[in-house]
């Protein structure tokens, strides 16, 4: 009995000491710097923004890319990296968010961005001279708390100042990796606090002399691999033809890392030249998989009504009938357990810290 009392007394003393420590931390670092997971203040539902691809939203498990996190999108040349990020920018702008594009490659096509649905008049753009400048601008924008999405295109183009000012043949090993490591250490906390989504586009390089495993690696060292909550590997797997003309690419995205849902899921979609991700094509494919759209031979039907012979015609039908496309999409989302988009009011998404 006495032992029990002693144990209870010790527990009470610990509780008192913990309360004093928590009070001291809050006084020193501000309210919310530490809290219990059971308290209502902790965000349980992750706020997301759609990728513009229904299949990829589903593969990510939470309905899109998580806000307040670092995301890396990498792949070979002409695989659709910039197209995918511009689609995310367009989706964020639809929610009323403010977006910035750090164009380190100096290669952003404004007309193409506009065709993908980006409001280029409202898009903030920077074309920095050095990697340090690009990351300082990113840091300043994140700290402002008024930016919802920042895209850095690309990590490979974040050239350290010492390399730009040096001679062409100078060997400066690990300089870019150190720059990225320092920047991400500084950025991560602020990104979470301001609920800003930061997307790094990255390129692929080949490791020399690799006998086993993949010889592919991404540029900029290992820091980004650790700090990224989501890593997407995007690949072009085929061409889409209309007659003899190639009108787009068949694309595969693999969720290589995911801290907010199970990883290693894959999404397949079409990127049409000049139009971006074919959402109607995805709705058809996923609708067939979920048995919401019937496919008989080359014909596609919905609710017993034929919507087109061949995928091109069915895609065109859904483009001309957006209400039916939305209805099928909502049924697909319900069947796969993903919440419908825009279920959170825009004002709430933008103002929440």
From Swiss-Prot:
It is found in: Cytoplasm. GO terms for biological process: DNA recombination; DNA repair; SOS response. The keyword Oxidoreductase does not apply. Keywords: ATP-binding, Cytoplasm, DNA damage, DNA recombination, DNA repair, DNA-binding, Nucleotide-binding, SOS response. InterPro entries: AAA+_ATPase, DNA_recomb/repair_RecA, DNA_recomb/repair_RecA_CS, P-loop_NTPase, RecA-like_C, RecA-like_N, RecA_ATP-bd, RecA_C_sf. One of its GO terms (molecular function) is single-stranded DNA binding. Gene3D superfamilies: P-loop containing nucleotide triphosphate hydrolases. The keyword ATP-binding applies. ATP binds at residues 75-82. One of its GO terms (cellular component) is cytosol. It comes from the Bacteria. Belongs to the RecA family. Can catalyze the hydrolysis of ATP in the presence of single-stranded DNA, the ATP-dependent uptake of single-stranded DNA by duplex DNA, and the ATP-dependent hybridization of homologous single-stranded DNAs. It interacts with LexA causing its activation and leading to its autocatalytic cleavage. This is Protein RecA. It comes from Cupriavidus pinatubonensis (strain JMP 134 / LMG 1197).
């Amino acid at each position: 009995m006495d032992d029990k009392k002693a144990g209870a007394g010790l527990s009470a003393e610990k509780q008192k000491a913990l309360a004093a420590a928590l009070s001291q931390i809050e006084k020193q670092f501000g309210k919310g710097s530490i809290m219990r997971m059971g308290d209502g203040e902790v965000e349980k539902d992750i706020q997301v923004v759609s990728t513009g691809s229904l299949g990829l939203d589903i593969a990510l498990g939470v309905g899109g890319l998580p806000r307040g996190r670092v995301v890396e999108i990498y792949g070979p040349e002409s695989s659709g990296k910039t197209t995918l990020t511009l689609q995310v920018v367009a989706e964020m702008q639809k929610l009323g968010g403010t977006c910035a594009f750090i164009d380190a490659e100096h290669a952003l096509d404004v007309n193409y961005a506009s065709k993908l649905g980006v409001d280029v008049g409202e898009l903030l753009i920077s074309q920095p001279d050095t990697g340090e400048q690009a990351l300082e601008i990113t840091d300043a924008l994140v700290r402002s708390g008024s930016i919802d999405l920042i895209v850095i295109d690309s990590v490979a183009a974040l050239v350290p100042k010492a390399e730009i000012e040096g001679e062409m043949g100078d060997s400066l090993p690990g300089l870019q990796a150190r720059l990225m490591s320092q920047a991400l250490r500084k950025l991560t906390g602020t990104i979470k606090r301001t609920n800003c989504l930061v997307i790094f586009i990255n390129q692929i390089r080949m490791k020399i002399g690799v006998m086993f495993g993949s010889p592919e690696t991404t540029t900029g060292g290992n820091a980004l691999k650790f700090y990224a909550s989501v890593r997407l590997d995007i690949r072009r797997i085929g061409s889409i033809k209309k007659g003899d003309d190639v009108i787009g690419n068949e694309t595969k995205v693999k969720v290589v890392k995911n801290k907010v849902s199970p990883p290693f899921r894959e999404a397949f979609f079409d990127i049409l030249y000049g139009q971006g991700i074919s959402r109607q094509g995805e709705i058809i494919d996923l609708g067939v998989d979920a048995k919401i759209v019937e496919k008989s031979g080359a014909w596609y039907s919905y609710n017993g009504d034929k919507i087109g012979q061949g995928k091109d015609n069915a895609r065109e039908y859904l483009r001309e009938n957006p209400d039916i496309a939305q209805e099928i999409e909502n049924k697909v989302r319900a069947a796969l357990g993903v919440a419908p988009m825009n279920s959170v009011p825009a004002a709430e998404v933008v103002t929440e810290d």
